[in-house]
């Protein structure tokens, strides 16, 4: 029986433990002798105490005890059970964690903090924005009978104070040395550097540490623009000083909407280990509408109810806020301005005010600071919410300048080429230099000079052509009182502002109404299109609404909750493979926040499933690939112990050397390769995942949907099972909102057949590789030798072609007849020259026919790699790296696939795109049967030019730095996919007879192609024009060398490769020095070392590394995948095969030279 054993991970001693025990949630046999059975935490604790083996498990037990204590207290104070989100917070609070409480109003943040402040029995500080909120909290604490101070700082009490008090009496609050600091509305910290510094003092952060952190952050920013060894050393020295600091104060942040931007704010974030900001939730239950009226009073009469928020577009200014407020009051309504402070909200909540009027500004209190679910029913936008800038100022953003230049028909191609590949830091430096009119050095300096000239050209062109208005797909430029301004629709302000009418109340989401008074048709059209794509908002004409029904629903959703949308809350941990993927998922569900656990980044976001009305508070962490590997400790046969009954496979954590980058699979204190003591263990990531798993309701493991991804998922599942039993495997083929939500809905268990197949393949790789490598090291006296079963045939092909190439070197004459090339080979240069001197070419058209051509299917991994090389000379390692990044950025589907199938959703993307460009050639093809994966396709109906525009508008949205290769590969994938969903093309094939110096050649070539898919995915056509005849002599061979593309095609044809191994196999040969890749054309050439290795393998182990034997083994692995073959049988067959290697030791019989 196949069994897995980890050499670490016991929840008590962190020692060796079997998978069976981990899955049962119990410690190792040394700690807890006896049969494997599921036991609860308290029983396990008691048994460990009984056996005197209690170690680390005590922490798990104590956390549970503290959690139970605070649950009892919560029920006593509140009179009911905490919600899922409150349980999550309480769990973290009792463990002393510092973090942000992210949730909409109405889910009990303040209640949770009041309960915890009572539970903590320590000097604490509760900082709130207003006196009224301070008084409310004080009153609640007094009713509970807890020690509370509301007027002056006192030790051993809960001190409830306003920010004003903190700023006024900072020294007194520092003096009481609170152990717990809770901050409501932390925007007060984030807006003011002075307040941030005062909060740092309350947190007892030494001034020197705070100043050093600011200095370190400044130096790191400088390093973005230039590599400087002195700066790097300064940063390292500061980091070593700062990292020794650990705060003794627990810091909790609630209700923050801003991101920390200043150096003081960023320093605070660095020192407390989390972002003092909270997740922005864009969940809405809103009727979005528009009208062309501009009369607010008339609109209010039509709605027929009070409880409205009027947001005035910023370009109208404070004057219109005053005017609208006065007009409403004159009509007999009670209206009040919402400009600053909090009094307006108190009056509105108490029913003393009917309407609030404020500015449609993202940072304004009317958009950010109003949470009144019962009374606020609708939002009226006076004018399309927009940002207005002087045109000249907007040109300091070079990407905006490019778009305006294009609108003016200026040639900005060269500017685009230089800008599009800048890093975010470089682009920011250029913006700042243009805005402040300062110079930069090097290429950025030249770019700033040229962009300054472009600004002048744009302004002169607009003036010379007397242009009053320009409209693009993202902004409008208009002339206003002899000056030009640029207007952008404010998408986020609309989402946030309209969302004020739809809040959490009594466990449900209230219904809201939004009405935009359209003052600019073009801007509204841009707003409408962007909202439809980003937030799935659809606007209705206000005049077509049945207002009596709307009014009834608005009120009903607030009276008894029955008319609102009922919401469920859940907490989860989502484990992915890469940090980029973690950031992408965090972004697509709103604006998340980042914290660190044991130095590992964790992204917090809120996933909202509208269909089940579930809010999933989600922590996202990256495993960074595999967390374990077959151990190289001296255990069994290369880590595998075999006895009569079982095959026990032993796994170690991965130890990565921070100096040389090597990975080690046994416990070491120094790197065996470079001697460095800077070793990082994957145990740190395991511990971070374990910690979060204790806090959440469910764990979703979303590693890649392939064999390797399943093994990573299995390791995570096994190692965290003692901490959470609600663990699910989810998988998706693309990183989009819909795909992730569907994956969560379809959560499943680990596919153990895939895991067993991976284990068998890894054992084969280890056994064959280590044994053959041992022979090669001895034979060649070189430690950098290694090979495996798949590398053997590939090395054979490369060595063979290299030998044939060298044996047939001569001269090649290229005869270019129009755009068709005929090649002739000669042994000597003289023969080639003679041939050219006598050259006589005659081309005769002898036949022509018309035929239809069907489109090619969408890409699989092998066909993508082949086309990337043949069309753009992108070698396969770069192509796979770029495809990985495009997948992780959410732009294409999973790129390791041998399926050509397209899902109905994929087909709809092609339909949408073809309709958008006005094509009638959509056909729609599913291309084969549905399987685990789809073909490689785009995730949106966005071509490469649209992608460029998106990146120009927001260079940071995809989280990767785009290069020419990213655009080329995306364009290739997009065109191939769209073409695969189109009708057939019509081609004309022409047959030619070519007479070259008396030799006759007959060829049939496509000479015309039109219609169908050819408009998107072009087919090469030829023009054999003998009047355009050129020749060239070059050194070459009768035999071509192999490229990556050739090797991939051979691997696929001989069934010795899979999408995940195509590139890795060749890279391994290059890494060992057996093969080199030519610089110009990426040919693969065998080295002398590679030749010697092949000769040894061919002489002694030819059968073992043959194509047929390798293909046979891969077929067996596939059968294990499908549960048609036992992994144990395959492993035992391998063991018998390995014995042949050990029996044949070439060094004992002869010395290889």
From Swiss-Prot:
Q: Where does Zn(2+) 1 bind?
A: 10, 13, 28, 31
Task: Give the binding site residues for Zn(2+) 2.
Answer: 657, 660, 671, 674
Q: What is its EC number?
A: 5.6.2.-
Q: Which GO terms describe its biological process?
A: DNA topological change
Q: Where is this motif: DEAD box?
A: 184-187
List the subcellular locations.
Cytoplasm
SMART domains, per the entry: DEXDc, TOP1Ac, TOP1Bc, TOPRIM
Q: What does this protein do?
A: Modifies the topological state of DNA by introducing positive supercoils in an ATP-dependent process, increasing the linking number in steps of +1. Binds to single-stranded DNA, transiently cleaves and then rejoins the ends, introducing a positive supercoil in the process. The scissile phosphodiester is attacked by the catalytic tyrosine of the enzyme, resulting in the formation of a DNA-(5'-phosphotyrosyl)-enzyme intermediate. Probably involved in rewinding DNA strands in regions of the chromosome that have opened up to allow replication, transcription, DNA repair and/or for DNA protection.
Q: How does it assemble?
A: Monomer.
Q: Which family does it belong to?
A: In the N-terminal section; belongs to the DEAD box helicase family. DDVD subfamily.
Name the UniProt record assigns to this protein: Reverse gyrase 2
Q: Name the source organism.
A: Sulfolobus acidocaldarius (strain ATCC 33909 / DSM 639 / JCM 8929 / NBRC 15157 / NCIMB 11770)
Chain's gene name: rgy2
